[in-house]
C-alpha cells in the first residue's frame, strides 16, 4: 500500500543511495520500508574516529510529520545516549520538522560525536567524564570504538557459511 509516509521513505532511500552524506549509510529492511538499519562512521579527529556504529530507525505512518524512533544498536558511551541506545537529540523530539529526512537525522546524530551536549545528559557518567576527566572519557569511548569493530567482525563471521571447513582433505 502506497502512503505518503512510504513514498517519502522511498525518496529518502533514493537520496541515501545516490547522494549519502559522508560517513553515514542507511536502508530499509528488505521486507519493511518502515524499519531501517543505519550506520554512522565515527568522524575523524574525535575519540569516535573510525568506529562503526549501527542504528535502528522505526517510522510510523505519520512520518515525516512525526520523527522516527531512533536508537543505537551498537554499544555507545556518549553523554547524549541512554544505556538502551536511545538518543537525546532535540530534532528527534521537540524540534522536529518535516524537512528533516533520513540523511539529516544521521548527520545530526553524527555531529553529536563532534559536539556532545553534557548540559543535557542522557548518560550522566559519560557527561561527567567528558566535562571533568577528558582522558578517562576518551579511553572509554575508544573501548566502545574497538567493540564496534569486534561486533562487525562477529557479524561477518556469522554471515559466513564456512563451507570450506567441510572440504578439508586432511
Swiss-Prot record:
Signal peptide from the UniProt entry: none
EC number: 2.3.2.23
Stretches the record annotates as Disordered: 148-170
Transmembrane regions: none
Domain UBC core stretches: 4-150
Enzyme class: transferase
Family: Belongs to the ubiquitin-conjugating enzyme family.
Designated name of the protein: Ubiquitin-conjugating enzyme E2 2
Native species: Eremothecium gossypii (strain ATCC 10895 / CBS 109.51 / FGSC 9923 / NRRL Y-1056)
Gene symbol of the encoding locus: UBC2
